[in-house]
């Protein structure tokens, strides 16, 4: 039995310890906000926070995150930074197809938690591993800047 802390809730699972966190979230807990994209930690659609850091859940075994605080897209809006990012995403009309957006939001929230006023280069570096098939990168950057301004006020 492995115990996980997901969105401030204790979850126990009998899944194999090498089961990727993504499948516990989606298949066992029906938390479908975190997406499966590539399965190789290359696209960022599966990004969640583990102990405050962005992690690719598609390749992260549950044994590696047992006892650590896991935050998903379903709960990021409860934080000041996460709410600012989500609100900016709406104002800037970031999503097109929307598939990558949960991972994008999670990466942006992690960036703004650490860097309150990122430059374009810092935004690009932080968001580098999050792919968007629809190429909404200019709107993603604009939303991150808007969220940073909101957090500064």
Predicted regions and their residues:
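Signature of N-terminal electron-transfer/Fe-S-associated modules in redox systems
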Residues: 1-153
């Amino acid at each position: 039995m492995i115990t996980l802390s997901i969105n401030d809730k204790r979850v126990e699972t009998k899944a194999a310890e090498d089961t990727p966190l993504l499948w516990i979230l989606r298949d066992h807990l029906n938390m479908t906000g975190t997406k499966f994209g590539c399965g190789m930690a290359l696209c960022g659609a599966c990004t969640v926070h583990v102990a405050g850091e962005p992690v690719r859940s598609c390749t992260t075994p549950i044994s590696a995150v047992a006892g650590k605080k896991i935050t998903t897209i379903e709960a990021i809006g409860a934080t000041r930074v996460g709410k600012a990012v989500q609100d900016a995403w709406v104002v800037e009309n970031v999503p097109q197809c929307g598939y990558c957006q949960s991972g994008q939001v999670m990466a942006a929230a992690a960036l703004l938690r650490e860097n309150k006023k990122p430059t374009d280069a810092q935004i690009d570096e932080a968001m580098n591993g999050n792919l968007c098939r629809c190429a909404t990168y200019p709107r993603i950057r604009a939303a991150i800047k808007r969220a940073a301004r909101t957090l500064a006020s």
